[in-house]
A protein has these predicted regions:
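Membrane-embedded alpha-helical bundles that constitute the cytochrome b-like, heme-associated redox core
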Residues: 1-171
Length: 171
């Protein structure tokens, strides 16, 4: 028996069905202690990061159609968004501030999960949360990567030096 499954699936399809059919239980679990829902315990950082992700999708979709991803036009398209597009400056600011907040909230969420030990096995039999921790680390790295790439999009002097420093760190 696989120690990572509380359910012992007989096939890959049954395992996949178990994951997809129980996905909603993550958002609406059957048992939740009052202590885990207290503001001073969780600070609702996971919910806030999900809300910020939704904000970034909603503010990023219009920017996706307005931005021109070329070395020659990147800076000019940012200026067009700022000064020509109606509410463009506001939209870009909402997206930028949301991205900064997302990095901070996701990092705080990681620290909170680590300090409270929420990544360890749950109270029920067969609840293995180590995979949740690994998925959280992957999502943190993805958040940092996307934040870095968004930082480069204007392709101005600041972005140029960010690429220079980033590639030097990577090498």
């Amino acid at each position: 028996p696989d120690p990572l499954w509380s359910l012992q699936p007989r096939s890959d399809r049954e395992a996949g069905d178990a994951v997809t059919s129980n996905f909603a239980f993550h958002a609406f679990p059957a048992k939740v202690s009052k202590a885990s829902m207290a503001w001073n315990y969780s600070f609702w950082l996971g919910t806030i990061s999900a809300a910020l992700f939704l904000l970034l999708i909603l503010s990023g979709a219009p920017l996706l159609f307005l931005y021109v991803p070329s070395v020659e036009r990147a800076y000019a398209s940012i200026k067009d968004i700022e000064y020509v597009v109606t509410f463009g400056s506001w939209l870009r600011s909402v997206h930028r501030v949301g991205a900064h907040l997302m990095v901070v909230v996701v990092a705080l969420h990681l620290v909170r999960v680590f300090l409270t030990g929420a990544y360890k096995n749950g109270p029920g039999r067969g609840q293995h949360r180590e995979w949740n921790w690994l998925m959280g680390i992957v999502m943190l790295l993805l958040t940092l990567f996307l934040s870095f790439t968004g930082y480069l999009l204007p392709w101005d002097q600041l972005a140029y030096w960010a690429v220079t420093v980033g590639t030097n760190i990577a090498s």
